[in-house]
């Protein structure tokens, strides 16, 4: 028997992709497909060991509290996690030594590598800005991926003892310089025809570096999600970022 998996948000586009990926995996067993009107108790009744959550920021915290209290580990792709929410998840996990929660801003391996490479490059360049581009139905802006990328860049700059990046702007239309995430400008584009894309632009004297990532289809998330499902038993507690499961 394989790992027993429940999918929350199973009727959504990403959820349907994850359901198909689990069904195609010999070492996983899909035991629950939970939609917005379904009772979470189905997870317990069907013996789910791990859930995958691609729901909404409004629903995810209640889902996590239920899963943790019932000893079910969770792989979470839902966005909207700030420091306060992460601290709440840690509090729920206290004393739950056999429960793991993986929260990742992006499960596409190319996006994870973009975040890692950006953090590595940050100390070599005076300036850095992040541009994320998504379909117009995305509920949050900027994306969790862009925020996580900018936070990593800012942390690397701080560790290297770098000053604030140069910007002589004195007058600007509101929002034209993007949102500041720990001092790194982040710009969000919402456009028909897009799925999920990110560009990180670095600059210093006489040269620039652009790291670009594109997800053209929601299937790009499935391999990373399955890495999380298969390995979460070895990672009790809260882990933020799939890179920690990939040895990066």
UniProtKB/Swiss-Prot annotation:
The keyword Zinc-finger does not apply. PROSITE patterns: DAPB. Gene3D superfamilies: Dihydrodipicolinate Reductase, domain 2, NAD(P)-binding Rossmann-like Domain. One of its GO terms (cellular component) is cytosol. The active site is at residues 134, 138. GO terms for biological process: diaminopimelate biosynthetic process; lysine biosynthetic process via diaminopimelate. Keywords: Amino-acid biosynthesis, Cytoplasm, Diaminopimelate biosynthesis, Lysine biosynthesis, NAD, NADP, Oxidoreductase. Its EC number is 1.17.1.8. CDD domains: DHDPR_N. This is 4-hydroxy-tetrahydrodipicolinate reductase. It comes from Corynebacterium glutamicum (strain R). The lineage of its organism: Bacteria, Bacillati, Actinomycetota, Actinomycetes, Mycobacteriales.
């Amino acid at each position: 028997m394989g790992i027993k998996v429940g999918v929350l948000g199973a009727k959504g586009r990403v959820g349907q992709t994850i359901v198909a990926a689990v069904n195609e995996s010999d070492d996983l067993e899909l035991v629950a497909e939970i939609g917005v009107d379904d009772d979470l108790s189905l997870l317990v009744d069907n013996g789910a060991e791990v859930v995958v959550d691609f729901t909404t920021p409004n629903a995810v915290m209640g889902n996590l509290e239920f899963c943790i209290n019932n000893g079910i580990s969770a792989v979470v792709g839902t966005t909207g996690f700030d420091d306060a929410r992460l601290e709440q998840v840690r509090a729920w996990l206290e004393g739950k030594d056999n429960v793991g929660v993986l929260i990742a801003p992006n499960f596409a391996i190319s996006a994870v590598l973009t975040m890692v490479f950006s953090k590595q490059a940050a100390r070599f360049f005076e300036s850095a800005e992040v541009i994320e581009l998504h379909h117009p139905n995305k509920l949050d802006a900027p994306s969790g991926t862009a925020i996580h990328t900018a936070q990593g860049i800012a942390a690397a700059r701080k560790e290297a003892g770098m000053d604030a990046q140069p910007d002589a702007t004195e007058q600007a239309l509101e929002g034209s310089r993007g949102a500041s995430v720990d001092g790194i400008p982040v710009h969000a584009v919402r456009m028909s025809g897009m799925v999920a894309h990110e560009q990180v632009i670095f600059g210093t004297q006489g040269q620039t570096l652009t790291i670009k990532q594109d997800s053209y289809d929601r299937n790009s998330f499935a391999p990373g999600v399955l890495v999380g499902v298969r390995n979460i038993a070895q990672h009790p507690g809260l882990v933020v970022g799939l890179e920690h499961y990939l040895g990066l």
